[in-house]
Amino acid sequence: MASRYDALIIGAGHNGLVCAAYLARAGRRVLVLERDDIVGGAARTQEVFPGFSFSVFSYVVSLLRPEIIRDLDLPRHGLHILPLDSTVTPLPNGDYLGQWGDHDQNRRELARHSLRDAEAYDDFGLLMHQMARAVKPLLAMTPPDPAARSPRHLMGLAKLGSYFRGLGRERFHVLHKLLTMSSADYLDEWFETEALKATKSASGIIGTFLGPRSPGTAYVLLHHYMGEIDGVFRAWGFAKGGNGSVSAAIAAAAREAAPRSAPVHRWRKCSLQTAAHAVSCSKTAKKSGRVWSFPAPIRGAPSCGSWAPRTCPAIS
C-alpha cells in the first residue's frame, strides 16, 4: 500500500464509498479506512443467524440519487432493486390497513376505514408529489452562507430567493407549513382515520430522534416522497441481497475506477496530524491533501497508541 494519497476517507459507509468512487473517477488516488469487517456503515447485510442474512440497519432503497446510480453504473456492479408494492399496518382490534401500489385497490382499502379519507387521499398525494418535485432540486445545491459577503455566496442567496419566489404564493405557503409543522398536525388537516395518520406519520420520524408531534417532522414526511427508482417518482424497493449489496456495488465501482488506489483497508485506530495533511495508520503515516471523515468530523490529534492493520475481507 502506498504512503501518499490525494485523499483519505475515514469510514466506508455508503456516503464515504460514493465520495471515494467520484474522487477515483476524477483521477485522484484514494484510500478508504474502515474499522469494521463489513463495508457499508448502516447500509449493510449481515448473517444474524447461521445461514440467514439480513439488512440490519437501512432496509429499503429509494433516496439513493438516480444520478449516482447512473454515474457509477451500479446495476453493472450488481445492484438490483425489487419494487416494494405494498405495506400493511396491523391494528389493535385485529384489523389492518393495507397500502397498495394499485390505485383502485388502495382506494377501496381506504374507503373500508373512511370514505372521507379515501376521497382526500388523491389530493393529498398530488400535493405532496408536487411539493417533492419542487423541493428536490434544492438537495443538489450547495447552501450559501448567509453571513458571507463574497460574490459567490451573495449570488447563491439571490438564486435561492429567486427559486422560492418562483414557487408562487400558494405552494410557498404549503412549503412553510411542511418545514415548520409536525407530521401529526399536518396529517390532522387532511385525514380522520388514526390508522392512516399513524402509518403516514412513521415516514415523518424515520432517521430522527423525534416523535410525530415534533415540529419539523412534516418536512421529513415530504422528504420521503422524493424517492425514485428507475425514473418512477415516489417508488421504494428492496435491494436484492439486502442493502449491503448497495454498498458492495458502490465499492466495486470505486475499485474499478481506482487501479492506483487501495479502495478499502481495515484499521482499528487512526490519528489525524498536521492540519489534516497526514493520518497515522499502523507504523506508517499516510500523507494526503484532503481527509474526509464519515459520519462525523475528526477533532483533535490523539496519540497514535497501538496499531493493528488488517485488510477488509469484504473488499480485498
PLM feature spans:
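Short helix-loop-beta connector
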Residues: M1-R4, Q273
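A short, glycine/Asx- and small/polar-enriched loop/turn
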Residues: N93-D95, G211-P215, S271-A278
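N-terminal glycine-rich phosphate/pyrophosphate-binding loop and immediately adjacent elements
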Residues: S3-A147
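Active-site/ligand-binding neighborhood in enzyme catalytic cores
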Residues: H129-A257
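Conserved acidic residues
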Residues: D6, A278, V291
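Short loop/edge segments at beta-strand edges and connector loops
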Residues: P83, P263-H265
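Glycine-rich loop(s) and the adjacent beta-strand/alpha-helix scaffold that form part
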Residues: W236-A257, H265, C270-Q273, C281, ...
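Flexible loop/turn segments at secondary-structure boundaries
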Residues: I38-A42, I206-F209, K269-S271, G300-C304
